[in-house]
Amino acid sequence: VCFGEVNTPIERLQMKHDEALGVLKDMGYDLLDAGLVIDDEKYATADAAAEKLRGFDMCCLVVCAAGWVPTHAVIRVTDQYRHIPMLLWGLCGWKENGRIITTAEQAGTTAIRPTFEALGYDFKYVYNIIGKDYPRAKLDAFISACAARRALRDARVGTMGYRDMLLFGTQYEGNSMRGQLGVEVEPYEMLEMVRALDTLEPDKIAEGVKYVEENWKFEKPCDEAIIEKGVKYALAIGKKITERGWEAITLLDVDGMKKLESFPPAMVFILLEHYYHVLTTPENDVMGCVTQLIMKYLSGQTVPYLEYYEFFENSEPVTDGPVTVLPAAFGLLNTSLLCVSKVKTGYVTCARLAYMHGRYRMHVYTGEAKTPPAWNEFGWDDPA
């Protein structure tokens, strides 16, 4: 929605509206243009704009000031959508014959801004500067965040079991997760997976085994029975993913797949991502799943899950190349496939969601990913 004052020439306001709309269109957003609003006495333009917006499923309302405008005309529209995040965007003047010409956009935004704050709106303030390019990066950052927030409200995560190994950091609180972030977490029992194994189509199993053998790189020979077992688990879990529409999934790992089925689920996770395009985490890490979803919605990229193992004073130390697996033993388990794929190096963003004192917070940092020295986790066959 673009706003201007009734005494400003409508042609100039329309021109500024069209330019701003063009910038947003060029950035690739799915837009609804509610038009130009002025402070006419009977709020005809304001009410028309509000009506255009009615029923549109929006993640963000862009409130664009093309010039000074009395705040009451703006609130006439925005207060009907106070539950929607807003981007308050002040345009700017221009230079003509060596003079600055302005429609006093920031006179409008600096009055609107404290009112929005007083009314409790959730908004971001961005403004243009004469002679500078449009603040596209700031516009995109906020609108993308709003889109991610909206997507989370429809997101569902599946968890086989709960609190693997009695871990603390993987727990979640369902009401706050749904209320504050919007994510619905749906548990299901390992027994569902086990019973689904007998319902699988032999052709699908054979196709899965063929895919693994032809596309994965094996560091040493592997018994086909191990591959078939992993494919069957993935297809059985996939039935539930398809049925419930999950976008991310986490499994009962150590106390479930390893302890009860004697099968570390590394290859199962790889296949679930391949077949069903879901994000995956081990060990009932629901918070890890939600972290992945947030970062995926913000970046548009698949978000891998990694763990910390060591810190170094000077850090010398997603896959790069084919999926690489190694038949290996771990502890009491004598048959399993260990994922030993190479991880891409370069600039990375690392993130983790946490719930503390009734609020969610995200720890985010960037770094340079480098190839680590040779290493393996104690307990696995050497080398692993």
Residue ranges and their predicted role:
Residues V1-R113, E117-R149, D154-G158, R163-A248:
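Metallocofactor- and cofactor-centric catalytic cores in central/energy metabolism, strongly enriched
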Residues E11-E19, G67, P85, G90-C92, ...:
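Anaerobic metallocofactor- and corrinoid-dependent redox/one-carbon enzyme cores
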